[in-house]
Amino acid sequence: MSYQLARQFLFRLPAEASHNISLKMLKMADNAGMLGMFMPQMYSRPVELMGITFPNAVGLAAGLDKNGDYIDGLSKLGFGFIEVGTVTPKPQDGNPPPRLFRLEERSAIINRMGFNNYGVDYMTERLRKKKYGGVIGVNVGKNKDTPAEEAASDYIACINKVYPYASYITINISSPNTPGLRALQFGDSLRSMLQEIKDCQERMNQQHGRYVPFVVKIAPDMSDDEVHMVARTLLDYNMDGAIATNTTLSREGVESLAHGKEQGGLSGAPLTKRSTHVVKELCVALEGRIPVIASGGVMSAQDAVDKVRAGAKLVQVYSGLIYRGPVLVREAAEAIGGLDG
């Protein structure tokens, strides 16, 4: 059955139910050995970045597999890397449903999930048991009830657990669905937290004899000056990379649609242009000294190419996968692989 046929069925269901059923179907197909029969071989054009060899430049963004339950099935879809999470130290339910909405007319999604996950101990066990041996990123966050001034302790608690299993770790300070989280992107709050996180990275490196890169995921809802300010701080603290961007609070172009005014972060096609602009500004500000991974509104191969031309070294997809299916992964990887240089 083609993805487009499956989508017709899945899109008749509420968005969160569709999400959960899709992942369970993927796991069943993988366990039955069926995915290899239907999925094309992964496109290979290796990218060397942060001391890691990525088989291709297209990865899965965090948010689809929050607990690491579906890594092995997702690995069959052609991704050059997979990012799981966001995971927090303690399990939490997230916000009450309904909390996930499709805006099909604009190929968009609004979510206010609120870091629902089973906690870092569960995630660590899933990472330990996975068969997938490729590049795995782990996206870490803070619990909702942890005060912002104590956020670093939550990130460090997660890092301490997942470090042995992660290829890289993403510090998520940009979700719009955890109160006060985005304030950590600026000023003394960011500097203080990054210092503690870098100290933790050094301890983990010494303890495990293995350096795991740390990247910071930023929001799209910043002025150019704010993007440059964040970039300077990332450089000051020798962060290994950045992901641009998370979801947006803007509702430009979707206000009149059903669910268009729901609270939460907007992703998909309406985010494409803004996210690419932030990627470009961030790359300029970072002066090529640390790499940028582009995420946000990658709905086509051309979108992926535009992100790379804006300066990104890798791209991630999520909403595009929901609307286009696995074909997007190969199309985007081939398009990036075909670029000169």
From Swiss-Prot:
Keywords: Cell membrane, Flavoprotein, FMN, Membrane, Oxidoreductase, Pyrimidine biosynthesis
EC category name: oxidoreductase
Keyword set includes Transcription: no
Ranges in coiled-coil conformation: none
One example GO MF annotation: dihydroorotate dehydrogenase (quinone) activity
PROSITE patterns hit by this protein: DHODEHASE_1 (PS00911), DHODEHASE_2 (PS00912)
Known pathway: Pyrimidine metabolism; UMP biosynthesis via de novo pathway; orotate from (S)-dihydroorotate (quinone route): step 1/1
CDD domains assigned to the protein according to its UniProt record, in alphabetical order: DHOD_2_like (cd04738)
Subcellular location per the Swiss-Prot or TrEMBL entry: Cell membrane
Chain positions recorded as FMN binding sites: A62, G63, L64, D65, K66, T86, N139, N172, K217, T245, G268, G297, Y318, S319
Catalytic-site annotation from UniProt: S175 (nucleophile)
Cofactors (names): FMN
Membrane topology: Peripheral membrane protein
GO CC annotation terms, alphabetical: cytoplasm; plasma membrane
Top-rank taxon: Bacteria
Residues reported in the UniProt entry to bind substrate: K66, N111, R112, M113, G114, F115, N172, N177, N246, T247
GO annotation, biological process: 'de novo' pyrimidine nucleobase biosynthetic process; 'de novo' UMP biosynthetic process
EC nos: 1.3.5.2
Database matches in HAMAP family: DHO_dh_type2
Function according to Swiss-Prot or TrEMBL: Catalyzes the conversion of dihydroorotate to orotate with quinone as electron acceptor.
Family to which the UniProt record says this protein belongs: Belongs to the dihydroorotate dehydrogenase family. Type 2 subfamily.
Protein name (record): Dihydroorotate dehydrogenase (quinone)
